[in-house]
């Protein structure tokens, strides 16, 4: 048995129905469903929050082939029951915007500075950053080019698309930039971002770290 992750196919899906397959007691209750729209924390992106019927889901995480939905209590929920599930759409959008902004920064820097390669990203609000390795250019040069390149890409409202099998070889493509493997959620185009600010660029021990924030 596995949880079908509907958000992999449609990041805009905010409501659905699902069947409860397991209830796990513990310090926090865990609800497992046959399918979900809740993005499980991972890949540098925070978890969705929302409701299973009227029960508040405060966190979602991967566990083997399941997505575990964390709750304070189960209320009257039972295994086998069909439930309505919904996510906090504003919360989803905040994290989707931060995630795609990280991809955009990686794509722009790799295009402008081919000797650099993105090696990781953390897309949490207030902590968002992308790290690169390779031949490090002057920080001032990166700062100047990235600011203008970000503004141009957002102004052009470049489309963001899912490529490949959403449940297999899923990739995210921003316009004509190379598609990258990703299991996160993203807006349909860059215009949603409005503004991405590069808050800090740091170079240390062969690693370039670009920290950023996204306008609400």
Regions found by a protein language model. Give the residues of each.
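Active-/binding-site microenvironments in catalytic and ligand-binding cores
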Residues: 1-216
């Amino acid at each position: 048995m596995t949880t079908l992750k509907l958000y992999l196919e449609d990041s805009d899906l905010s409501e659905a129905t699902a069947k409860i397959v397991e209830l796990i007691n513990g310090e926090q209750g865990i609800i497992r469903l046959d399918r979900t729209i809740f993005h499980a924390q991972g890949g540098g992106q925070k978890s969705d929050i929302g409701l299973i019927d009227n029960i508040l889901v405060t966190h979602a995480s991967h566990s083997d082939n399941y997505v575990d939905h964390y709750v304070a209590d189960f209320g009257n929920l039972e295994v086998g029951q069909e439930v309505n599930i919904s996510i906090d759409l504003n919360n989803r959008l905040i994290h989707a915007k931060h995630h795609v902004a990280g991809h955009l920064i990686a794509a722009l820097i790799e295009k402008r500075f081919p000797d650099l390669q993105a090696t990781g990203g953390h897309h949490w609000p207030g902590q968002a950053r992308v790290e690169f390795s390779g031949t490090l250019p002057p920080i001032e040069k990166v700062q100047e080019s990235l600011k203008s390149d970000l503004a141009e890409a957002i102004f052009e409202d470049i489309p963001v698309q899912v490529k490949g099998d959403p449940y297999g070889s899923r990739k995210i493509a921003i316009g004509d930039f190379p598609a990258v493997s990703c299991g996160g959620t993203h807006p349909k185009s860059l215009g949603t971002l409005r503004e991405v600010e590069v808050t800090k660029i740091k170079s240390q021990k062969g690693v370039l770290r670009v920290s950023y924030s996204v306008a609400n």
